[in-house]
Structure formats: structure tokens, C-alpha cells
Amino acid sequence: RISLLDSNGKKTRFLFQVKTALRLDNMLVHHARVESFRPPAPYDAVLSRAFASLADMVAGCRQLLAPRGCFLAMKGAYPAQEIAQLAPVYTVAAVHELSIPDLDEQRRLVELVIRNSGEAP
């Protein structure tokens, strides 16, 4: 299952139309702010598209992630300063360079994991 979350009603209405038109039965669309959203079960992965710094993202989304899950963050240039500001419990598992056709800009996918799921960041 894939859950999509956005606080913008116009975006969630569009996503719901896409879900319906393409008959994507494994997709759920949620209209809510991440800070107040509580899923019925934690997710194996949480993907964010440039809505905050890495530190703010993991702090705001921690309640969504399963103990052995990973955060995936879409970024532009290599976020060295943001990585340095992460709490020590987070490890950068990988930084993937992305190539997007017809886009002459840097894009990266940062993969973060929690070192010890028993520790609270």
C-alpha cells in the first residue's frame, strides 16, 4: 500500500482523481498536516519531497516510521550542512544522484535510517 499525505486540499483532490482514474486500489490519499497525522500502522518508508530540512523532516515524521524503516528525502545539491545537523541516532545509508530528463539541475535522494530503534531522537 502507498499512502500520500498533503495538507493542501487542492493537491489531495487531484491525487484522489488520479487514484480513481487509474484505479489505483493500493493507494490512499490523506488530507492532513504531517504533525497531526497518525497512521493505523507505522510505515516501512517515509518519502518527503523538499518540505523541510532533514532534521525538521525526521523530527516531524518520526511517528510515521516503523522501527526498522527508512526516511527518503528529495534534495537538490548535496545537503552536507543538513546532514551535519542530524541527531546522532540517524545514519545516512546512501545519497543517490538522480538524473531527471530535460532538467539541468542537481537532484538527490537521501536515505536515512535510525541506528538503534530503542533510542528516541
Regions of interest found by a model, annotated:
Residues 1-6:
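Conserved SAM-binding motif I beta-strand of class I
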Residues 11-13, 79:
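Short alpha-helix immediately C-terminal to the canonical SAM-binding loop
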Residues 23-34:
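Conserved SAM-binding strand-loop segment of SAM-dependent methyltransferases
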Residues 35-45:
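A short acidic, Gly/Pro-enriched loop at the edge of an enzyme's catalytic core
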Residues 48-49:
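Residues lining the SAM
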Residues 55-70:
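A short glycine-rich, Lys/Arg-flanked "PGG" loop and its adjoining helix->strand segment in the class I
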Residues 68-80:
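Conserved beta-strand signature within the Rossmann-like core of class I S-adenosyl-L-methionine
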Residues 77-121:
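Active-site capping/gating segments
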